[in-house]
Amino acid sequence: MPQTDKQVCIPPELPELLKQFTKAAIRTQPPDLIQWAAEYFGAMSRGEIPPVRERSEQVPLSNWAELTPELLKVLHSRVGGRLIIHADELAQMWKVLNLPTDLFNSVMNVGRFTEEIEWLKFLALACSSLGVTIAKTLKIVCEVLSCDHDGGPPRIPFSTFQFLYTYIAEVDGEISSSHVTRMLNYIEQEVIGPDGLIKVNDFTQNPRVRLE
């Protein structure tokens, strides 16, 4: 193979382009990520609007069940508290609930999951297909994970919230790590009580908590 002295020049705007691509992929949930990526970047190169579905658009699901927080809660209970689950087993659980296969594949692609899946990360991305904003996505995750049966507001350990918020913000790509750290520090120091739990109201109705 002939050698070349040419250097590959990486444009400075590439990181931002990739962030926008990742966010668009999560919003659109394409069944074939590779084909959609080709169409996305092809449109960008031609100066056209890329094929990004808005949150308000409805996806035709034919005979599939519609993904809901209630079904995600059922799925979470079947995972049984495991942190890691095998892809084939999770796919079978998803199938038993009659959930859309294309959505499962899209979450797998966006999360870059392989055979061993970190369940909380998969759950966070699945919830992001229902939530318009990061705050609403985290609200749904809290509702799914909460084990309270006393009729109180959904709540989860702050450590779990910290993990989920950091991950979702990283995938979203538009929120600086410094902002995430600042919000988490404020919540931990000013909001969280002795029980170490965070309630949905703590980050949805507190004017000083702005997750985005």
Swiss-Prot record:
Note: 'Ropporin' comes from the Japanese word 'oppo' which means 'tail'.
Residues modified to Phosphoserine: 56
Location of this chain's protein in the cell: Cell projection, Cilium, Flagellum
Keywords for this protein: Cell projection, Cilium, Flagellum, Phosphoprotein, Ubl conjugation
Protein name (Swiss-Prot/TrEMBL): Ropporin-1
UniProt GO MF annotations: identical protein binding
Annotated InterPro entries: ROP_DD
UniProt GO cellular component terms: cytoplasm; motile cilium; sperm cytoplasmic droplet; sperm principal piece
Domain text: The RIIa domain mediates interaction with AKAP3.
GO annotation terms (biological process): cilium organization; flagellated sperm motility; protein localization to cilium; regulation of protein phosphorylation; sperm capacitation
Similarity section: Belongs to the ropporin family.
Quaternary structure, from the entry: Homodimer. Interacts with AKAP3. May interact with SPA17. Interacts with RHPN1. Interacts with FSCB; the interaction increases upon spermatozoa capacitation conditions. Interacts with CFAP61.
Modification(s) after translation: Sumoylated, sumoylation decreases upon spermatozoa capacitation conditions.
PANTHER family: ROPPORIN-1-LIKE PROTEIN (PTHR14952), ROPPORIN-1B (PTHR14952:SF12)
Boundaries of every RIIa domain copy: 12-43
Function in brief: Important for male fertility. With ROPN1L, involved in fibrous sheath integrity and sperm motility, plays a role in PKA-dependent signaling processes required for spermatozoa capacitation.
Gene: Ropn1
Main location: other
Species in which this protein is naturally found: Rattus norvegicus
